[in-house]
């Protein structure tokens, strides 16, 4: 979305049914996770405003494709994996994982940003080395 001068991301919280997980208050969870990740030093787009009644978040827009789009095009910057691992060095001691899927990352200005505000309790089977890394490989020619 735009105000005529700048672009923004307007994220609408959605409530899809899930048989194996109870989300609780998703808006409050996103806000709590944003603050947690921000305090840890995870690169995030800035949260600019919250419309609680409509469950919407207004975030800074980072121009450019996601890491997933770039990986699909055969483009993997040499430092992306190091940047994700640097995030892990902040997350794991705090007992957290993030969603390491490349659609949740946008490279901008030499920094890989995590554009989702979600984090979860650390579980080794869902950490970067055991789960996320498999999605950060270039497609076979």
What role is predicted for each listed range?
Residues 42-83:
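Conserved structural core of kinase catalytic domains
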Residues 8, 43, 57, 113-115:
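Protein kinase-like catalytic core scaffold
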Residues 1-4, 60-61, 108:
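Active-site beta-strand termini and strand-to-loop segments that position acidic
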Residues 1-28:
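ATP-binding glycine-rich loop module of kinase domains
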Residues 92-97, 108-141:
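C-lobe/activation-segment region of protein kinase-like
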Residues 83-90:
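Conserved hydrophobic core/spine positions of the Hanks-type protein kinase catalytic domain
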């Amino acid at each position: 979305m735009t105000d005529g001068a700048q672009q923004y991301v307007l994220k609408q919280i959605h409530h899809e049914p899930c048989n194996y997980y109870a989300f609780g208050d998703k808006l409050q969870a996103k806000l709590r996770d944003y603050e947690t990740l921000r305090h840890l030093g995870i690169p995030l787009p800035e949260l600019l405003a919250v419309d609680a009644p409509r469950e919407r978040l207004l975030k800074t827009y980072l121009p450019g494709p996601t890491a997933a789009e770039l990986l699909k095009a055969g483009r993997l910057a040499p430092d992306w994996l190091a940047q994700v691992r640097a995030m892990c060095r902040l997350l794991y001691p705090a007992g957290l994982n993030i969603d390491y899927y490349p659609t949740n990352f946008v490279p901008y200005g030499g920094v890989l940003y995590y554009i989702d505000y979600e984090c979860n309790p650390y579980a080794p089977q869902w950490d970067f080395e055991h789960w996320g890394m498999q999605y950060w490989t270039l497609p076979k020619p």
